[in-house]
Amino acid sequence: MTVRNVSTSSPAWARARALAVVLAATSLGAAGCSAVGPSANHGSTGGTAAGSGASGADSFGSPADPGAVKQGGSLVMALSAEPDKLDPALSRSLYSRYVFNAMCEKLYDVDQSAKIVPQLATALPTVSGDGKTVTISVRTGVKFADGTPFDAAAVKASLERDLTLKGSGRKSELGPITAVAAKDPQTVVISLSKPFAPLTAALTDRAGMIVSPTAAKQLGSNFASAPVCVGPFKFAKRVPQNSIDLVKDPNYYAADKVHLDKISYRIITDASIRAANLRSGDVMVADSLSAQDVPGLKQEKSLQVLQSQSLGYQGVTFNIGNSDGVDAPPRMRDTPEAKDPRVRQAFEYAIDRAGLVKVIFNDLNTVACSPISPASEFSSDAAQKCTAHDPEKSKALLKEAGVQTPFPIEMITSNNPDSLRLAQAIQSMVKEGGFDLKIKPVEYASLLDQEDQGQFSLLQLGWSGRIDPDANITNFVGTGGSQNVSGFSDQQVDDLLAKARQTQDVSQRRDLYAQVIDRLHQTDPLIYLYRQRNLTGVSNSLKGVQVFPDGVVRVALAGMAK
């Protein structure tokens, strides 16, 4: 693998200029589409070191000063895609995490520095010497939104639900749990069959959201229709494809810190319309700003743009063995791209990552060739190496594989303008490497359904990222992972990931993940493209909106400026 930079006199720069011309010619068609998708949020070249790019200083926002905000008022936030099921066990999208953040607290949270801090727990877990017993103390005097007491028994019930509910996306995240016990009302004891280093980090996300046992029992499989948790706000109403409303929860244990009366999340899938609504004041917060809109929004005196490097990535995923659905055992598909890794490798060689970052995102995003953020303590130079952009190598690999050229393949993507611009850029690039890429735009909800069912050859989608790399890797490429929509199964990868899960030693895990990523570049079930910036527009009429590296927009403790 080579590492190089792009200069304005290089061939890569010339390709970027040519790509810009292609995109200018196609942008009018893209702008007419308005369905949901993640690319606005959720480079050589491929040969440039991952993480390169000029993206500016991080701005996470600040907590609300109680003396500077009013009591009461309604906040309207525009979401770039509709949240999926509002059930922490079943949810898969970043957009549901925005809503959950205001209504479903977790055992642990992450702070602005991406460090783990207690939330419903009172301290970080204690772990036995053999790593197989984890003890967590939880808050007292807390109630769920329906009045049910929050205690260790409720935590036990919620974790057991995550482990047993059909379709749960949390089971693989929670690892080798064999039992959960409520030692006393304030103490939870988790038993493991083997040490599991990522457990605490997993409890900072949906696996750590504790649901009301009363509501879970009463609603059963319909829990998402009226979710009940512990949080500053509680669920009020949902209008599909339109809005989700939350109202202040008087049962919340820190209700005196909640300033707003109501939060309304409105689904506005077109980035330019979200920006226009920000300018007009019809919405006060907007997620996933388009890189095309950021310069203009920064000039608005009534607005601010919060931006920070995310822990996630955007990429493309090949369907290798998802023949019977993501929950079924992998069974290799009878297609050249599934059966021969040289076809997938050729696709990676054909992509100019730096060109994508420069032309599509104005260098706000950065090149990514790894699921691990360069800022992570688990990162290394080896983990961030990129495959060089080399169209001739791409064509040579296709020839070795004995497939027809140009090799035809269809890619599904969200049909919002930014996602389509990205897809068209990829289409233009890989053509030079011997591919005939067809683009199939679909709504975001449909994309999630199709990837689960294995109804695709190639898809473009990303991941908002987590602080522990296990959550960015194992669920997606580990055999049987809850989000392994590729149906990829590789014993070497599985063995390395299993070893990394069982050790607390950072240096050992760092080395193991570097080996995993090297193997992924050899097999290419998923090609990482770029690491997105968290770009959030906020009205200056609000105080206290924050966006941390986990990508979640935090509005629950915001307030209207006096």
Report the location of each language-model feature.
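Acidic-aromatic pocket-rim loops
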Residues: 312, 316-325, 446-502, 549-552
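N-terminal lobe/hinge region of extracytoplasmic solute-binding protein
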Residues: 4, 75-127, 160, 228
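Alpha-helical secondary-structure segments
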Residues: 151-158, 185-191, 231-232, 260-262, ...
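Extracytoplasmic/peripheral linker and loop segments enriched in polar/acidic and small residues
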Residues: 68, 125, 342-345, 357, ...
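Gly/Pro-rich hinge or "lid" segments in bacterial periplasmic/extracellular proteins
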Residues: 204-258, 262
